[in-house]
Structures are given as C-alpha cells and as structure tokens.
Amino acid sequence: MSEERHEDHHRDVENKLNLNGKDDINGNTSISIEVPDGGYGWFILLAFILYNFSTWGANSGYAIYLAHYLENNTFAGGSKLDYASIGGLAFSCGLFFAPVITWLYHIFSIQFIIGLGILFQGAALLLAAFSVTLWEIYLTQGVLIGFGLAFIFIPSVTLIPLWFRNKRSLASGIGTAGSGLGGIVFNLGMQSILQKRGVKWALIAQCIICTSLSTIALMLTRTTHQGLRQHKRSYKFELLDYDVLSNFAVWLLFGFVSFAMLGYVVLLYSLSDFTVSLGYTSKQGSYVSCMVSVGSLLGRPIVGHIADKYGSLTVGMILHLVMAILCWAMWIPCKNLATAIAFGLLVGSIMGTIWPTIASIVTRIVGLQKLPGTFGSTWIFMAAFALVAPIIGLELRSTDTNGNDYYRTAIFVGFAYFGVSLCQWLLRGFIIARDEIAVREAYSADQNELHLNVKLSHMSKCLFRYKQLPRRV
C-alpha cells in the first residue's frame, strides 16, 4: 500500500485499514487485512445484491399483503393493528438478537449462519401459505420471517468491507439497490399472483424465488481468508461496551437510526393503502409501492457515490431534510394517482439513504475495533422502532376527513426525517471537532477515538463548518 494513501487526509475512514500492524494508542495491535478491491469481490457484490433482493426487497412486498388483509378481512378476528404488528415483527424481531447473531457467525462461519437464515425464511413463507388462523400468521409471516431476514442480512452486510476498500459506499449502494429491484418484482409480481390465484400461491411463489436466489448467493459467498482469520482472533463478544455506550456521538447515532426507522417503515408500509384510500384499486396501490422500489434501485448507487465524494453525514443530513420537506409539501396535499406515483419515485430514491451509508458512519464514529459490538447495539435500536412503526402509521390514519386520510401520518413521517437530519447535523459537528483533535495529536483515522474529549463549545463552532475540514465527514 503506497505511503500516499496513508497520508491522504481526505480518505474516508471506510477506505482506511491500517496495514502496518502497528500498535494503536491503547496498546492494541491493529489488524492487518488485505482487501482485494475487486477480483472475486464482484461476485461477492452480486451475492450481496441477491441477499438484499430476497430479504429487504421481499419484505417491502408485505405492503401488498397488508392492503389485501385489511381490505378482505382474511383472518377471523384480525384487526389493522394485528396486521401492522405482523409487518413490524417481520421487519425487526430478528434484529433484536443482532449481537447474538454476530457472535454466532464469528464462532461458526458467515456461510453457515446465512444458510440457517435461508431455511428460516423458506420455512416461514411455506408455512404462511398454509396458515388459516391469525396466530399462525403471527408466527410465520411475522416472527420466523424476521429471524430469516436477520440471519441473512446481518452477516452479509460484513462482506463488502472484506472485498472493497475504494468506493465502499458506492459498492454498498449498488448492493442495497437489490432491495429496490426486489421491491419491484414482489410488489408487481405478487400482486398479480394474489389477484389471480390468492394469497396461498403468492406466498409459495415468493418462497421459491427467495430460497432459490439466496441459495445461489450463498454458493457465491466467500470471505477473504486472512481477513476472516484475523477478525475471529480479535473479536470479543461484548453485549454492553461502556466505552461505546458512554460516548455522546454513539447516542446521536442511536437517535438518527431510530428516527430513520420510524420514517422509513411507516412510509414503506403506508403508500399502498394510502393510494387505495384515495379511491384507487389495490393494483394501482401496488404501482405506487413499486415506484418506491424503482427510486431506491436508481437512487442508492447514486447516493453511495455522492457520499464517497462529499461524506456520508453531510449527504445524509441534506437528503433527510429533503425527505421531510417532500412529506409535508407533497404527501399532505396529494389527491390523485399521478402525484402519488411521482411522490413514491422521489422519496424512494432517498428514503433509504441510511442503508448505503450506515456502515461508513458507524465505522467513522467508533473505529474498526469497536465496529461489531456497536453494530449489534445499533440493530437493536433499529429493531425496536421498526417494530412499532407500522402500528403508529395505521393508528395515525384518519377516516373522518375530506381528502387525505393519511395527513397525520405524513406530518409524523416528515418530523421523523427532520429528526434524522437534526441528529446527523449534530453528529457531524461532533465528528469534525473530534477530527481536529485527532489530526492535531497525529492519530490515524481508523483507530478508536472514543476516548477523545470534545467540548460542547468546540462542537458548536463546528456545526456550520463546510470547508477546510480535517477529514471528509
């Protein structure tokens, strides 16, 4: 690795792995990991696309089932809160066990844990197809699918950093765009099957598609042997890390991911039923949900590229503020299908900004050494707020107004994204202030800098800094 790369102060922390094996400031030897930066990494990127297609992409298709269940009262005794809760469980329940899943794939292997996830997801969809009571749907389309998603996604998200260094956010953006492609397929395809053959065959078809593609991705999955071996030796399972949990920046991280999940999940699960509430059909509602997926397919790679160039927090702060404005200025007055489709396409391109940037931001805050444990805690916060988000979205719906039944939901989602932008703005100021201290004291950007003391006055001065930054942020 050339000396210029180590000296380039504009290089993002995601693009820095200390290759010299020197001791860090705490006396710990840094991990020497070779990153191929291509080669077989392109097959890994393809696998990551397929994993996202089969997990988050398939999960976004639940909006179609939700609208169908609400419209047809499919299961006796099922209320809108029940179906919303099932969607929340599918999205989040497995993520509550993220630290345990992280520990398991370090004990066994990434491939083994992902394989378990594929089995969980396939069994869940197949059993859901033959479910006839509400509690069976809770367990299959809710809990078991949630565990399948978590067992596949949490290990797979670590693959890109092992194979790519330069333009890592771009690679993550391309990979997470797979969820957008999946959303298109599952929103349109499952809606068509559901109308022609019913819920049972829609779930069976989804089972076949997800299991087949995830299995292909699993066969492509490899880890760089040196990186995996070093990482296993260095990994220490810590459910609660005082150094992490006592840091102000980490709680700003927890704040913005919590707000992001409230906005993201409520919006994702509401647009199809919102379109139906305007007087359109379920099929037309699926078109709007599909536009969200089209937007994410096109937008996430672009967001990743821009984040590599200007900084993940800077880009995220701006885009989440734009999201808030779109919800207030476009969703609230929306009265027709054309506006709903345009809104879906616009918000779809930026509402998932968290996915291509989260790894870069977490690493920026805690460094490589504390990354696994911090990610585990972060997933728990995301899971907690994603669990209640669908319920909040439906409860805010009003049926006694003339016009937009979801105007209160739109206001709520707008404030959720405003909260994301605010937390990222504060976090950005904190990181800039800490970077100034770290650069002055000659610390490498990939080291654990949680111990550096940032005064509130110093942070406040950095909130409006946009030029001559010590590092890209």
Curated annotation (Swiss-Prot):
Disulphide bond pairs: none
Q: Which residues lie on this side of the membrane: Cytoplasmic?
A: 1-37, 106-111, 164-169, 221-243, 305-312, 363-370, 434-473
Q: Kindly list the residue ranges recorded as spanning the membrane.
A: 38-58, 84-105, 112-135, 142-163, 170-186, 201-220, 244-268, 287-304, 313-332, 343-362, 371-394, 409-433
Segments in the Extracellular topological domain: 59-83, 136-141, 187-200, 269-286, 333-342, 395-408
Bilayer topology term: Multi-pass membrane protein
Sorted keywords for this record are: Glycoprotein, Membrane, Symport, Transmembrane, Transmembrane helix, Transport
MF GO annotations: symporter activity; transmembrane transporter activity
- Its predominant location is membrane
Q: Where in the cell is it found?
A: Membrane
One Gene Ontology cellular component annotation held by this UniProt entry: plasma membrane
Q: Cite the InterPro entries for this sequence.
A: MFS, MFS_trans_sf, Proton-linked_MCT
Question: Does the keyword field hold Transport?
Answer: yes
Q: Which domain of life is it from?
A: Eukaryota
**What PANTHER family does the record tag this protein with?**
MONOCARBOXYLATE TRANSPORTER, TRANSPORTER MCH2-RELATED
The similarity annotation says: Belongs to the major facilitator superfamily. Monocarboxylate porter (TC 2.A.1.13) family.
Q: What does this protein do?
A: Probable transporter. Does not act in the transport of monocarboxylic acids across the plasma membrane.
Designated name of the protein:
Probable transporter MCH2
Q: Which organism is it from?
A: Saccharomyces cerevisiae (strain ATCC 204508 / S288c) (Baker's yeast)
Q: What is the lineage of its organism?
A: Eukaryota, Fungi, Dikarya, Ascomycota, Saccharomycotina
Identify the gene encoding this protein: MCH2
